[in-house]
Amino acid sequence: MFHNLNEYITAEHALMYLSKADSIPHRTEGEAALLEFIPKDAKRILDLGTGDGRLLALVKIERQDAEGIALDFSPTMIKAAGERFSKDPKVQVIDHNLNDPLPNLGQFDVVVSSFAIHHCSDERKRQLYSEIFSVLSPGGVFCNLEHVASPTDELHSRFLRSLGLSEGEEDPSNNLLDVETQLRWLRDLGFRHVDCYWKWLELALIGGSKSK
């Protein structure tokens, strides 16, 4: 069931997430897998739900000259990302809620997201994927490191235990969806080379590219 709620608008919830982000099991493995799919010559990069800018900063390590656009709607996250990129004139942090249509920002060689899109309703997820396809340049790449639904309740409980959480401690703004449905959507929208490139329990890297 979709909870029409996103706790990250509150500073308390956003700060709690940031304090725990580095301890998410296997997160760095997923990020490393994502980086392998990002072209070294990418010129424009869009980061959806940037949080404190961690993923975009990783992408830019080997792409210093790339222009980065980072979207988020949490004042706490926007402030953190702004501070992270304060000395990088090629990065712009924009206040934007992913529940709303993407703003007109031009075309991008790469669109990335990390643990953000799963907060949207399923209908909005699919619509957002369509918008992502539209803003990708020919040959562009989309990579989404995401929190996805487990295929069974037992596996979901195992994932929660790995985080040291009980079912009552789950993020009420989560709206998890299985990998297979999202991959099907991407294929239907016209993405090529669609796959789940990496996965550990409920953490998955999904994506594809646009024809040249």
State each model region's role.
Residues 1-39, 54:
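Conserved class I S-adenosyl-L-methionine
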Residues 42-43:
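Nucleotide donor/acceptor-binding cores
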Residues 46, 52-100:
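Class I SAM-dependent methyltransferase SAM/SAH-binding core
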Residues 103-111:
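A short acidic, Gly/Pro-enriched loop at the edge of an enzyme's catalytic core
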Residues 113-117, 145:
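Residues lining the SAM
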Residues 126-138:
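A short glycine-rich, Lys/Arg-flanked "PGG" loop and its adjoining helix->strand segment in the class I
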Residues 145-189, 194-196:
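C-terminal alpha-helical "lid/dimerization" subdomain adjacent to the S-adenosyl-L-methionine
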Residues 189-212:
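Core SAM-dependent methyltransferase catalytic element
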